[in-house]
A protein has these predicted regions:
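Periplasmic alpha-helical coiled-coil/stalk elements that build and connect Gram-negative outer-membrane
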Residues: 2-10, 148-265, 363, 367, ...
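Acidic, low-complexity, intrinsically disordered peripheral segments
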Residues: 2-10, 29-45, 416-448
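Bacterial N-terminal signal peptides
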Residues: 17-31
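Small/polar, glycine/serine/threonine/aspartate-rich low-complexity segments that form flexible
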Residues: 42-49, 93-131, 243-257, 286, ...
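Amphipathic alpha-helical coiled-coil scaffold segments and their short linker/junction regions
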Residues: 57-61, 197, 201-202, 206, ...
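Hydrophobic/aromatic residues within transmembrane alpha-helices of membrane transport systems
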Residues: 60, 118, 164, 230, ...
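Amphipathic alpha-helical coiled-coil segments
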Residues: 69-81, 149, 153-174, 183, ...
Length: 448
């Protein structure tokens, strides 16, 4: 059996959570120029003839709403640290003091003046820096989640592309085999006409042709569904036209599960986000404990007495946490519970990621064996069986039922081989996501 056409390399992005965030800002073209944005919005026709994963990925990174939303959440979080670390806004006030109700006494009495004042609240040293740290940790966590969103969308795109390519590949197989079956029907009919065959052989071939037509109808419906799912990820109308995809090809994946676990601990944006959640919660606990300390208020006033000598006054106040047992104490309890929650979430996330890696690695291993089995043994043997049965039928040593059965077996095994290729590629994509890797960013993977 001839090898399938080669799909262009699934170009990836340099790994690591920090890199994901950086690429999200620039290299992944999440902020295209106006001309590029116009191309993205008006670019539906560019996929009408053919589609490949590399172009689809670029389009997705520029247009997918999940990525855009994650990016904006990150940018919003980046704007908070400066706000949290700034002093409260000062208060400016004014007032007029008069000595009596009968007349205005400013300028004629020391007890009459116009006052201008300013007041500034100053939190206890360390509070503002802790507030800024908490906000910065949250911004970092949102950045990690932004990287996770990129990974998730790219993986969903690849899985949806594999589904779309599988349906197209299946349609090609069934249509090709439909032509072959029509030839078998013609051969059976020719033998029947000269009295060397049976009418039931012709009828069996026609029944099998009807079955293939039904299969084509089902596959066409699946093609429309797969195209709609792919368009959804691309942020295009569900019925937007999509051309012929590249055929699914076999990839080699040599990483062990232990190696992938080590990679995940360093690069997984979900694990990074969980750790930053712990850091944020611990900083929040430090801030809650700092609330036991008083804040200060600085004040300055100027008294204008018109023709008399003006006066000024400065002062300071302390905001005492008098009801600490009802307020600050419970704030510390709340923050401590938040730390426990964040640590538990980190542990749960770690367990989920590592378990997912083990499970997906087992799926990849099993799927690769099936691909090798079908591609290297089952399908070639089925082809030989059909060729042998066809030759035997021509000379009368094999009946038509045996020939038709050989054809049916080959058709099913070719379809199954395509399904196993798609299942293998999807499992590899999901495993890369779990380990925090983008496509083609795995050193142990190479094209065959």
């Amino acid at each position: 059996m001839s090898s399938p056409p080669t799909r262009p390399s699934k170009s990836g992005v340099v790994p690591g959570t920090a890199t994901l965030i950086l690429l999200g800002c620039g290299l992944l073209v999440l902020h295209p120029s106006p001309s590029r944005q116009a191309t993205a919005q008006d670019g539906a026709p560019e996929f009408e003839q053919s589609v490949d994963l590399s172009r689809l990925r670029s389009y997705t990174l520029a247009n997918n709403p999940d990525i855009k939303a994650a990016e904006q959440r990150w940018r919003a979080a980046q704007a908070r640290p400066s706000q949290e670390g700034s002093l409260p806004d000062p208060m400016v006030n004014t007032g007029y003091h008069n000595e009596s109700f009968g007349r205005l006494t400013q300028g004629s009495s020391d007890f009459s003046w116009i006052r201008l004042g300013a007041e500034q609240e100053v939190p206890f040293p360390g509070k503002l820096s802790l507030k800024e740290t908490v906000a910065a940790r949250e911004a970092d966590r949102e950045g990690a989640m932004y990287g996770a969103a990129i990974l998730s969308v790219v993986t969903r795109l690849r899985v949806a592309y594999d589904e779309y390519a599988l349906v197209h590949q299946s349609l090609e197989i069934v249509r090709r085999n439909q032509g072959l079956l029509e030839q078998l029907e013609q051969a059976a009919e020719a033998k029947y006409r000269v009295g060397e065959g049976l009418q039931q052989d012709v009828l069996r071939a026609q029944v099998e042709l009807s079955v293939l037509l039904g299969r084509l109808t089902s596959l066409e419906q699946e093609r429309q569904s797969a195209a709609a799912m792919l368009n959804a990820i691309l942020n295009r109308p569900p019925a937007a036209p999509l051309g012929t995809p590249q055929a699914i090809e076999k990839v080699s994946f040599s990483h062990t599960a232990d190696e992938l676990e080590s990679i995940a601990r360093e690069r997984s944006p979900n694990l990074r986000a969980a750790q930053l959640g712990v850091d944020r919660a611990e900083s929040s606990l430090d801030l809650a404990r700092r609330q036991y300390y008083p804040d200060f208020v600085l004040r300055a006033d100027y008294y204008n007495k018109a023709d008399l000598t003006p006066e000024w006054e400065v002062g300071a106040g302390i905001r005492i946490p008098l009801y600490f047992w009802r307020k600050q104490a419970f704030g510390v309890q709340e923050a401590a519970a938040g730390v426990s929650e964040a640590r538990a979430t980190k542990q749960s996330t770690s367990q989920d990621v590592l378990a997912r890696i083990q499970s997906l690695h087992a799926q990849v291993t099993a799927a690769e064996r099936l691909v090798d089995l079908y591609g290297g043994t089952v399908v070639p043997q089925a082809e030989l069986s059909l060729h042998s049965a066809s030759a035997g039928y021509q000379v009368g040593r094999v009946d038509f039922l045996t020939l038709l059965n050989s054809f049916t077996v080959l058709n099913e095994y070719q379809l199954r081989y395509s399904e196993e290729l798609a299942a293998f590629d999807k499992a590899v994509a999901q495993l890369e996501e779990a380990a925090g890797l983008l496509p083609d960013d795995v050193a142990g993977r190479s094209r065959q």
